[in-house]
């Protein structure tokens, strides 16, 4: 799809979003640009262009945009944090995606026997890039770009597996502490005495991330705050100390379980970062 065709589709079909423009993806995504050497980057700049659009914080409809890329990699998140929620029956599970994550079209098929509703909510102002089949054709001479996008899809899957493992913890305080430190590894900012997590996370949203009800989350957060582990509110959270100092007092010392979790999760938290997703093993 050319820029003219995409812009025409945006206008005629009423696609959501604003500030639609055609941009060089390598200028917007520094990590992607770093996949290429200087000369390759110079040659690829003119080809690695994509339609970009923005969305304000709040509910976002991405289904129509995803319909524009049935044969392409998908919609790439450039900036912001997006809550992607899946509803089956009366239960909702949520995943947070951010810069570098790739969203694919919602494929249906006979193997899907359960009705599942997908919704998106921008927690922060968002910018996206539309990577369609035309984009793939333009960058075919630089396979590093496609390989990097494939690795990112794998990274997102691993992050989701980590979140599922966190949700399996029996104690809700432990689930919340692990989740917040996990999110801090990606979006946290080091501050004196701990890490600041500048993402608007309501109690309801936290519950949807770790399979818990909102009232229980509120009580668990109050207990964490009373212990000096976590402070803050819906717009910003502060994680005090380091994860290896916080978890042992929250976990029953059964068969050294607390020590195993601390050894993996807290390896780098003293420097203000949570562990890498693949380091979580218990």
Model-predicted regions and their roles:
Residues 74, 94, 127-129, 198, ...:
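A residue-level structural signature of the nucleotidyltransferase/glycosyltransferase Rossmann-like core
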Residues 80-81, 176, 217:
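Hydrophobic structural packing positions in well-ordered secondary structure
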């Amino acid at each position: 799809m050319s820029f003219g065709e995409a812009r025409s589709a945006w206008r005629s079909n009423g696609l959501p979003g604003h500030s639609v423009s055609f941009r060089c993806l390598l200028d917007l995504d520094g990590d992607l640009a770093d996949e290429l050497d200087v000369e390759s980057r110079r040659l690829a700049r003119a080809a690695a262009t994509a339609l970009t659009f923005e969305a304000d914080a709040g509910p976002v409809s991405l289904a129509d945009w995803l319909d524009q890329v049935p044969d392409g990699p998908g919609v790439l998140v450039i900036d912001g944090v997006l809550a992607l929620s899946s509803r089956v029956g009366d239960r909702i599970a949520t995943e947070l995606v951010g810069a570098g994550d790739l969203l694919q079209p919602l494929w249906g098929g006979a193997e899907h026997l359960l009705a599942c509703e997908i919704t998106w909510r921008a927690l922060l102002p968002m910018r996206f890039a539309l990577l369609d089949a035309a984009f793939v054709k333009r960058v075919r001479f630089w396979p590093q770009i496609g390989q990097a996008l494939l690795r990112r899809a794998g990274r997102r899957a691993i992050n989701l597996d980590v979140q599922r493992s966190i949700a399996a913890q029996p104690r809700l305080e432990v689930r919340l502490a692990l989740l917040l430190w996990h999110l801090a590894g990606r979006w946290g900012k080091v501050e004196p005495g701990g890490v600041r997590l500048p993402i608007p996370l309501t109690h309801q949203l936290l519950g949807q991330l770790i399979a818990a009800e909102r009232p229980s989350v509120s009580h668990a957060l109050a207990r964490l705050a009373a212990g000096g582990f976590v402070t803050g509110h819906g717009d910003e959270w502060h994680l005090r100390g380091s994860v290896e100092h916080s978890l042992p007092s929250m976990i029953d010392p059964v068969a050294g379980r607390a020590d195993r979790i601390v050894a993996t999760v807290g390896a780098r938290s003293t420097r203000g970062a949570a562990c890498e997703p693949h380091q979580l093993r218990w």
